[in-house]
Regions:
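N-terminal, Lys/Arg-enriched amphipathic/low-complexity engagement segments
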Residues: 130-179
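Short, well-ordered loop/turn sites that connect or cap secondary structure elements
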Residues: 157, 193-196, 304
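Glycine-rich anion/phosphate-binding loop at the beta-strand->alpha-helix junction
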Residues: 201-354, 387, 394, 401-402, ...
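Sec-dependent N-terminal signal peptides
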Residues: 4-12
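Short, structured beta-strand/loop micro-motifs enriched in basic residues and often containing a Trp
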Residues: 139-148, 180-187, 287-295
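Short, conserved secondary-structure segments in the cores of folded domains
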Residues: 153, 189-192, 300
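Central antiparallel beta-sheet cores of small beta-barrel/beta-sandwich binding domains
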Residues: 18-112
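A hydrophobic, small-residue-rich beta->alpha segment in the mid-to-C-terminal subdomain
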Residues: 356-402, 406-407
Length: 443
């Protein structure tokens, strides 16, 4: 099976990025450190992660998660990494200062007779900036409709920094009712996060999600995944836009022109973000902002609210964080195809967990940890959510597979988060109270 590549070199004992130490570093030939490796795949830069440790002339570590061994002689580097299927990544390079340049030969088990050779340049990951975290006021003027690594960052921030900004609604309309951009979940961002590198986890804490206008729009239809043939016939005349009044003072939303039986119908406001995303691996075409996947995206999960923390796997340097698609509230699954779509006032704080590789989006609230699965079918989404949570339990709580199965079997709570878009969403939740009793919880 062909590997999907993103490379970052990580090694214990990263030296400070001080220009005066470059010559000394080369002379001492110390390649220990975290590196981002930019590899040229036919004109497209693909990013990799590697972790190296140097002991004399011996190198060890991992390359894109695969065990690596190699040598450093003078400024010449050789390494060989092997995956579990027998594929290899063989590199030859030269080291100078904070840069490694060379070639890497990828040999895949299913194409062993046709190895691929590509040039690369690797640079040390910058160290985390010292000092007090900053709060940034950002007024968006450009909104993107793809979760792309090619989009120019609108702002560069550091781990620990906060950003206060706004989003337009799914149709591209702002808080004043002015259409700013074509619809389709246009996003605010991307925000580049210093030190975030492939193989890390980006942490996004939503400290503020507030309505900034008094109306929203939705629909009067039900999406196809939720319809049987009889209900589809009954719903054939649906699809009309329904405008809702948002009463922030009383915390309620009501249809502005209610039909006969909805004249007293009101639902509680619970502002949320439908979209929180990082740029996906550039080996794939950039997805539109209506899509979702391992990178997050249009997840439409109604527990991504004020106070929640979202965890996303980083695939490109800087992570490139996007936010958008505000909902005044939404039922499970986003059954109308649109929730109560509205613009939003947003504040978030970012952090980076170096070297932590998670398989997909996760959310944490005051009471629960939540693992998401976003796939083409509900069955596949169910499996992915379960695997995502199992990884969380084994990595963070040090459970064995047997122990994880027992916890899942007694504590799992499943929610259908999304059925409106190409990918369906399932979320597996576990109450934190259940986890407090685990022997590893305090370690």
């Amino acid at each position: 099976m062909r590997k999907v590549f993103f490379l970052l070199l990580f090694v214990p004992g990263v030296l400070q990025a001080q220009s005066g130490q470059e010559a000394a570093r080369t002379a001492n030939a110390d390649v220990s450190g975290r590196w981002v490796v930019n590899t040229d795949f036919y004109g497209t830069t693909i990013y990799f992660r590697m972790e190296l440790k140097q002991e004399g002339e011996k190198l060890s570590g991992n390359f894109d998660g695969d065990k690596l061994e190699g040598t450093l002689k003078g400024t010449s580097i050789y390494f060989l990494a092997k995956d579990e299927q027998g594929g290899t990544d063989e590199g030859k390079a030269t080291f100078q200062g904070r840069t490694i340049t060379g070639t890497v030969v990828f040999t895949h088990t299913d194409e062993a007779a046709h190895p691929e050779t590509h040039k690369f340049t690797a640079e040390l990951v910058p160290t985390r900036r010292a000092g007090t975290p900053q709060r940034h006021e950002f007024t968006p003027t450009t909104f993107y409709r793809q979760f792309s690594a090619a989009n120019k960052p609108v702002l560069t921030i550091s781990p620990g920094d906060s950003v206060h900004t706004t989003t337009v609604d799914a149709g591209g309309t702002d808080e004043k009712g002015v259409t700013r951009v074509l619809g389709g979940n246009p996003e605010t961002g991307p925000f580049s996060v210093e030190t975030a590198s492939p193989g890390d986890t980006l942490v996004v804490h939503l400290s503020r999600l507030r309505l900034n206008r008094d109306w929203a729009e939705s629909d009067d239809s039900v999406v196809g995944r939720a319809l049987d043939s009889d209900l589809a016939v009954k719903m054939k005349d649906g699809g009309k836009t329904v405008r809702w009044h948002l009463d922030a003072e009383h915390g309620l939303a009501t249809p502005e022109k209610p039909a006969e039986h909805l004249t007293r119908y009101a639902v509680p406001l619970r502002p949320m973000l439908g979209c929180v995303a990082v740029a996906p691996n550039v080996a794939q075409a950039a997805p539109g902002t209506g899509d979702s996947g391992r990178y997050g995206g249009n997840m439409d999960f109604n527990e991504i609210v004020e106070g929640a923390t979202v965890y996303l796997p980083v695939s490109v340097p800087g992570a490139l964080l996007y936010v958008g698609d505000g909902h005044a509230m939404q039922g499970d699954g986003e059954l109308n195809g649109n929730a109560l779509e509205t613009s939003m006032d947003v504040e978030f704080t970012v952090d980076v967990i170096p070297g932590k590789r998670i398989m997909g989006p996760r959310v944490e609230s005051a009471t629960h940890i939540m693992a998401m699965g976003l796939e083409g079918s509900l069955d596949d989404a169910f499996r992915t959510a379960t695997a995502n949570m199992a990884q969380w339990l084994t990595d963070e709580y040090k459970l064995t597979p047997s122990e994880a199965a027992q916890v899942l079997g007694t504590s799992a709570e499943y929610k259908v988060s999304e059925v409106a878009d190409r990918n369906a969403g399932i979320v597996l939740k576990i109450n934190k109270e259940r986890l407090k009793s685990l022997a590893s919880a305090g370690k």
